[in-house]
Each structure stands twice: as C-alpha cells, then as structure tokens.
Amino acid sequence: MLAASVLRLTLPLCWLVAPQPTQPERLFHSRDRSDLEPSPLSQAKPIADLHDAQSFLLKYGWSEIPSPKESAGVPVGFTLAQAVRRFQKANRLPASGELDSPTLAAMNKPRCGVPDTRLPPRAALPTPPALLTSLGLRPRARQKRFLQMLFPKPDGQQEDASDTGASRAFSKKTLTWRLVGDAYSSQLSGDEQRYIFRLAFRMWSEVTPLDFREDRTAPGTMVDIKLGFGRGRHLGCPRVFDGSGQEFAHAWRLGEIHFDDDEHFTPLSSDTGISLLKVAVHEIGHVLGLPHTYRVGSIMQPNYIPQEPAFELDWADRKAIQRLYGSCKGSFDTVFDWIRKERNQYGEVRVRFNTYFFRNSWYWLYENRNNRTRYGDPLQILTGWRGIPTQSIDAYVHVWSWGKDERYFFKGSQYWRYDSENDQAHTEDEQGRSYPKLISEGFPGIPSPLDTAFYDRRQQLIYFFKESLVFAFDVNRNQVLNSYPKKMSQVFPAIMPQNHPFRNLDSAYYSYAHNSIFFFKGNSYWKVVSDKDKQQNTRLPLNGLFPKKPVSEKWFDVCDVHTSTLNM
C-alpha cells in the first residue's frame, strides 16, 4: 500500500529577481505575426527503457532519491517494481510491476511537471550530478535547494486543510497576477494570452472568495502570481523543460507558473494542440495549494486530457479549493424564481423555472437540478435584463394566478413591469402610460423605498417589507389589508426565541424547488414554515421562521469575480 503523502505543491521561488524595464519589448504587439520566423520546436526524449522509467518515477515522486552508497537511479526503500506498481494502480493499469507497453505509454503522456506524490522524509543526502540531470534539474543546483523544492516546509502563509496534501498558499483574498513582459509565448499573441489567463483566474474566482486582479505596473516583487513561457533552461528556474511532448508546465512555491514554449499551446477556439486555458487552470490550482489527483473529471489530474472544450471545475475540485479558502458569502439585493412556459414535442405546455440571485450590478442563475450556479456566472444585469435598473434592485414580484401573470421589479420609489415574452421591460401599460411608475400609484398604501417583497400564491397576497413592518397587499382589490401594516415578528414569528431577522430584510422569495418561502439577511437565511411542515408538526406556528442557517450551506458558489472579467 502506498505509504506516501501527496506532495505539497508550493515549491520555492525561482524567478530571477532583476530590474525589469517599464515597457519591455514583447514578441507581438498589434502587428501580424506571419512575417516572423519561429525557431523550430525541441522534441522531448521519449521514455523508452528502464533508465528513463527510473528517472521518471524519481522526478514525479513515485520513488525515493538514492543515497551516494546506492547506484544512481535505484529507489531507496521501495524496489522499482513497487514504484511501477503504484504508478500503474494510480493510472488504472494492471498493477503487475512490469514496465510494459501500456505503462510506458502512460509515462509518455503530456503532463504537468509538478510531482504527484511525496514519499516518507529522509535525511538530506547529496545527490549525484548525473541524477539531477536525469530529473530535469541543472547539475549545479544544490542538494539542499532540490530537497526544499520537492519537500517544502510549511510557512506562515500555509495551513494544512486535510491529509490529502492540499495546503493554503495565500492568507489574503485579493491576489494580483502578471504575465511577465519578456516571457510571452511565441505561439499566441500577447492579447490572446492575457485574455486566456484572465479567464483561467476567473474560473477559480467563480467558486472561491478569491479576487484575482491583473497588475501590470507594480514592482515584480509585489505581484503575487507571475506567469511566463520559456524553453529548456528558462526564467532562472532550476528545472529544465524537456521539449514538446511531455512536461508542458510547472508551478512553483509563492506564485510562479512556467509554460514550456516548445509545446503547441492553442487558443480557446481551437480543438487541436494543448489548450492553454486548461493548462493554466490546472497550474493555478497548484499555486493556490491543490495537489495532483487521479480522480476522473478533475482538472488537477497530472496528465493532459485532450478533446474537452467545455471543461469546468467539477464538484470535488470546488470542494477541495473551498476547504482551503472557504466558501463565498455575501448579501443579496433580491432572489427569485423565474417562471416560464415551454411546449414539449407533443405540444403540451410545461412550466419551468430558474432561480436568480441579484447583487449590486451582477446576477447569477442557479441551477437547482445541479445545485450550483451556472458556469460562467455572474453576468451584468445590463446585459441580461433589458430596461430595468442596472444595479441595486430592491425587489421582484411575480403575481401568478388563474387570471394574472405579471412580473414587477422595484427600486427606490418606482416599479417596472417586465415582458417575459420579449425579454424586456414594458415601456408603457395598456392605457399608454409609461413605465417606470411610482409605487404609490400602482400599489396604493405601500411605502418606498422597499426592503423586499414576495407574492404568496396561497393567499394571493403580496407581502411588502419595510424596516420592521410588513404590508399585506390584496392583488385582486388592489389595496393593503385593513389590519396591516404589522410587525414582521408578529406575522412571521420565530420558532426559537430571538432567532429572527426582525427588520431590514435583504430578500424574500418563494422557492419552487423547495416549495418553501425563504428570508435572507446578510449571510443567513430563515425558512418559513410551509403547509407540509405544519402537517408534519401541528405545533409549529403559522408562517413561523425556522432558526437561521448560512446561505452558503444551501446555495453554493454564488461568488463575485473581478470587474475586469465580468463580460468574458
């Protein structure tokens, strides 16, 4: 059984600290690059024999570094067969321990240069220069530094998250990055590279509270994550790239990512070569503290898997990074289910719905079936909802009954009616009067601005919330009920004393996915006692509020991203 723990992927800083020109010359500017004569790509030497396989197993952590008393290339503590067997098992090959053709083929797959595993620690021993060369390291690299690269000690910025080898690499939530000016790729234009990297960082930001910002002006020592391309001996790094076909990139401790420019990196629109986006997302995962995993579907698999254009971070990758940096939190301006009618292949009308979360000028679509936000969200309200205010909406109400199907957005002292058929706000009503209208005109007796509102289909009432008061509005009579307004705590009493929002709700909505009403305030939510809850426990108060819970434990990955990446 493998007695090794996964290698911590936070390796020592290796970028040469040298003055950089304020505007370094780049390979590409805005000109066409067809006149350039690119240098021929170097090809990696394939792993073909026992010696190559030994070097591979050492380089990627499957066997231990030999001492001077042992012949170079012979693992310590584990035989070669044991190391091969462990590698085969991880790669879902028959664990024979024999260096057969399928095993050699697995070793020759394009892969990340970060080691896969870490064996039990041993005393620091000098390593023969020949072995360093076979591992892709410069012979002059000192053994102490080599061991630090493979087995880094925890520092003040790191904290173990679990026994999987993952460790938190940064203690702050806002991180800067830069594509180093003299280390652009010869494969793509500078604008393409930076766009791809912005998207790669955004994909991690969509599932964590981390905020990634490109910084092209600060001193290099102040930038958290630096990216660059090189060939062979590159960027002052002790690791030497092997040419096209095997190691395509590696990540280093304290925020460095190097890409082998001998590889055929391709842009988003290409279905050939190696996707720079996919490699970048993988290496950023290392810089943030995630190790390799051989789990199918993970972006952190060590080998490159081609022909996967629509890849995303899967559930386990999301949970792994959130164990290090936490889940996303934050209040919402409004939350609602958007109801739509569709006809199936038989012409039958089916009612569908999606949940939307609005915050500031952004919105997220929540896929209840998958229990996560839609890939690529958030988006700007401006681009998805035509004609309504572009930020800080107070409430959404869908009056839906046998005789009505009306949708309203509220902000300040005004409201807008939305046309779901044409996907835009109405500009005027049936009498030719223009929208937006004053809340006091369309909903007499309702104050403004509102905190929030929702429509209760059971009673055909709109509940409007203002500070500690609630107003029940009869949509059929177009008036507030005589006994209202009332205290929110009176209409929606707490089941547990003092466990109540009391005033200033952020949002309230009826969820068709959960058949329940929810109140939101800050990072918490309260579930309103439903008819089903009352049937199961008759002692529960009518419209009572169950104790609050964290929003992030029920609705996952509603995360902000940096404004520079909103329209990607």
Curated annotation (Swiss-Prot):
Residues 25-143 form a propeptide. The keyword Calcium applies. The precursor is cleaved by a furin endopeptidase. Glycans are attached at N371. Residues 1-24 form the signal peptide. PROSITE patterns: HEMOPEXIN_2, ZINC_PROTEASE. Its cofactor is Zn(2+); Ca(2+). The active site is at E283. GO terms for biological process: coronary vasculature development; determination of heart left/right asymmetry; determination of left/right symmetry; hematopoietic progenitor cell differentiation; proteolysis. One of its GO terms (cellular component) is extracellular region. Disulfide bonds join C328-C559. Its EC number is 3.4.24.-. Changing W177L: Miri mutant, animals exhibit visceral heterotaxy, with heart defects commonly associated with heterotaxy. Changing Y325N: Koli mutant, animals exhibit visceral heterotaxy, with heart defects commonly associated with heterotaxy. The keyword DNA-binding does not apply. It is an enzyme of class 3 (hydrolase). InterPro entries: Hemopexin-like_dom, Hemopexin-like_dom_sf, Hemopexin-like_repeat, M10A_MMP, MetalloPept_cat_dom_sf, Pept_M10_metallopeptidase, Pept_M10A, Peptidase_Metallo. Keywords: Calcium, Disulfide bond, Glycoprotein, Hydrolase, Metal-binding, Metalloprotease, Protease, Repeat, Secreted, Signal, Zinc, Zymogen. Hemopexin repeats lie at residues 329-388, 390-446, 447-495, 502-558. Binds 1 zinc ion per subunit. Belongs to the peptidase M10A family. Plays a specialized role in the generation of left-right asymmetry during embryogenesis. May act as a negative regulator of the NOTCH-signaling pathway. Cleaves alpha-1-antitrypsin. The conserved cysteine present in the cysteine-switch motif binds the catalytic zinc ion, thus inhibiting the enzyme. The dissociation of the cysteine from the zinc ion upon the activation-peptide release activates the enzyme. PANTHER family: MATRIX METALLOPROTEINASE, MATRIX METALLOPROTEINASE-21. This is Matrix metalloproteinase-21. It comes from Mus musculus. The gene is Mmp21.
